[in-house]
Swiss-Prot record:
Gene: SLC25A24
Gene Ontology CC terms: mitochondrial inner membrane
Region (Linker region): 159-168
Biological source species: Bos taurus
Solcar repeats: 192-278, 286-371, 383-471
Binding site for Ca(2+) 1: 32, 34, 36, 38, 43
Record-linked Gene3D superfamilies: EF-hand, Mitochondrial carrier domain
A single MF term (Gene Ontology): ATP:phosphate antiporter activity
Subcellular location(s) of the protein: Mitochondrion inner membrane
Region called Regulatory N-terminal domain, residue ranges: 1-173
Ranges of the Mitochondrial intermembrane topological domain: 1-197, 273-295, 366-388, 466-477
Name used for this protein in its record: Mitochondrial adenyl nucleotide antiporter SLC25A24
N6-succinyllysine, modified sites: 320, 437
InterPro entries: EF-hand-dom_pair, EF_Hand_1_Ca_BS, EF_hand_dom, GDC-like, Mit_carrier, Mitochondrial_sb/sol_carrier, Mt_carrier_dom_sf
Activity regulation description: Activated by an increase in cytosolic calcium levels that induce a conformational change of the N-terminal regulatory domain, uncapping the channel and allowing transport. Inhibited by bathophenanthroline, mersalyl, p-hydroxymercuribenzoate, bromcresol purple and tannic acid.
Length: 477
């Protein structure tokens, strides 16, 4: 695919007598289809496509954003040459970072090693598939010329940008608090990118949770009251809530759900870093198992810290109109009538739910990632937005399915003091009661609205997350 480009426009080591400006000028003339001395975005798209040059996602727009210095919507030769020179320098650094033994070639084992350092585990077979897409001469190694030719018009500037595609990011918020925290590189920590990404994720979570709050409240109502009447379906549940408290009541408890994002994220991130240090030796990179254990323990720590807010959210969601004037009034009444212990009702099933959720979520995501790399990573390791969102949504849904009975018991334990004549049962007692009176389906009451909110939550949080990253300077506009 790249032989024409290598042999005519970008000569290899055997033809280095041709100066870079001449190379760039020849290529520029090929792209300037109407010969007016400038290249617009449509000429760039058509020209690169006709030359068979591989492009990254939204490559043309990114090239123009970076290269069009005077912002006239066109690239003249000077702008074109400057962009390619600057981009080649960045790609040279990326090439050197992958070439671990400094022999001037990248091998499959070096790709595996480099990706492992950055937190992405792939097999050597998967690395060979990626290598084949870049390797033009069939040697199963990639030299500098092949690397440069492949990435010449791909705005990805370093290997870490490729890894960011495959990060199982918590920027995608579906309203659950059991996910494993994000992994940040040392450069991201030093540059302050980490807190910007966490802030972007927090804002995305707030918008996403607020947008899907009616479905979340319906889920809680079905978990708590569903056993009383088989008639509480989705339509009937919404009708009942609106009749009791009006449209605004659909968002009851959402304020607490949004407020707890900040302390929970902060504690989880801090705890995750501490547990990683305990589980790995200095200088050693964290593996998938250590990440799972550290993430689960960090989640448990964060949940311990903010759990009273989980109880408040449930009480507010289940409460009747006028029962509580707000979060602080609810806390005051619980403390007065039930004591401090009420703020940790349902804590044990909540804690137990972290392991199946986080473990299955991570395992399914890794499985989907491996499947994609094995079967579809022929031209790029960038899977595209839809694949990433689909993998994230599916893995999270599987995690929810496994941990849902524990989540339901937790919610009932949090709310059972509000239900008249309801016995105050512990976790085992509630499981027995539900199974004896409602059967296995009783452990999954409310799961339909819970699944219904996954797709809108993923879509909304992704859009807000990406826009917030641009606003905060994490990514370019």
């Amino acid at each position: 695919m790249l032989r024409w480009l290598r042999g005519f426009v970008l000569p290899t080591a055997a033809c280095q007598d041709v100066e870079p400006p001449t190379r760039y000028e020849t290529l520029f003339q090929k792209l300037d289809r109407n010969g007016d001395g400038v290249v617009d975005i449509s000429e760039l798209q058509e020209g690169l496509k006709s030359l068979g040059i591989p492009l990254g996602q939204d490559a043309e727009e990114k090239i123009f954003t970076t290269g069009d210095v005077n912002k006239d919507g066109k690239l003249d030769f000077e702008e074109f040459m400057k962009y390619l020179k600057d981009h080649e320098k960045k790609m040279k650094l990326a090439f050197k970072s992958l070439d671990k033994n400094n022999d001037g070639k990248i091998e499959a084992s070096e790709i595996v090693q480099s990706l492992q350092i950055l937190g992405l585990t792939i097999s050597e077979q998967q690395a060979e598939l990626i290598l084949q897409s870049i390797d033009a001469d069939g040697t199963m190694t990639v030299d500098w010329n092949e690397w440069r030719d492949y990435f010449l018009f791909n705005p990805v500037t370093d290997i870490e940008e490729i890894i960011r595609f495959w990060k199982h990011s918590t920027g995608i918020d579906i309203g659950d608090s059991l996910t494993i925290p994000d992994e940040f590189t040392e450069d991201e920590k030093k540059s302050g990118q980490w807190w910007r990404q966490l802030l972007a994720g927090g804002v995305a979570g707030a918008v996403s949770r607020t947008s899907t709050a009616p479905l979340d409240r319906l889920k809680v109502m079905m978990q708590v009251h569903g056993s009383k009447s088989a008639k509480m379906n989705i339509y009937g549940g919404f009708q009942q809530m609106v009749k009791e408290g009006g449209i605004r009541s659909l968002w009851r408890g959402n304020g607490t759900n949004v407020i707890k994002i900040a302390p929970e994220t902060a504690v989880k991130f801090w705890a995750y870093e501490q547990y990683k240090k305990l589980l790995t030796e200095e200088g050693q990179k964290i593996g998938t198992f250590e990440r799972f254990v550290s993430g689960s323990m960090a989640g448990a720590t964060a949940q311990t810290f903010i759990y009273p807010m989980e109880v408040l959210k449930t009480r507010l969601a289940v409460g009747k109109t006028g029962q509580y004037s707000g979060m602080f009034d609810c806390a005051k009444k619980i403390l007065k009538y039930e004591g401090m212990g009420a703020f940790y009702k349902g804590y044990v099933p909540n804690l137990l739910g972290i392991i199946p959720y986080a473990g299955i979520d991570l395992a399914v995501y890794e499985l989907l990632k491996s499947h994609w790399l094995d079967n579809f990573a022929k031209d790029s390791v960038n899977p595209g937005v839809m694949v990433l969102l689909g993998c994230g949504a599916l893995s999270s849904t599987c995690g929810q399915l496994a941990s849902y009975p524990l989540a339901l018991v937790r919610t009932r334990m949090q709310a059972q003091a509000m239900i008249e004549k309801s016995p105050q049962l512990n976790m085992v007692g509630l499981f027995r009661r539900i199974l004896s009176k409602e059967g296995l389906p009783g452990l999954y009451r409310g799961i339909t609205p819970n699944f219904m909110k996954v797709l809108p939550a993923v879509g909304i949080s992704y859009v807000v997350y990406e826009n917030m990253k641009q606003t905060l300077g994490v990514t370019q506009k």
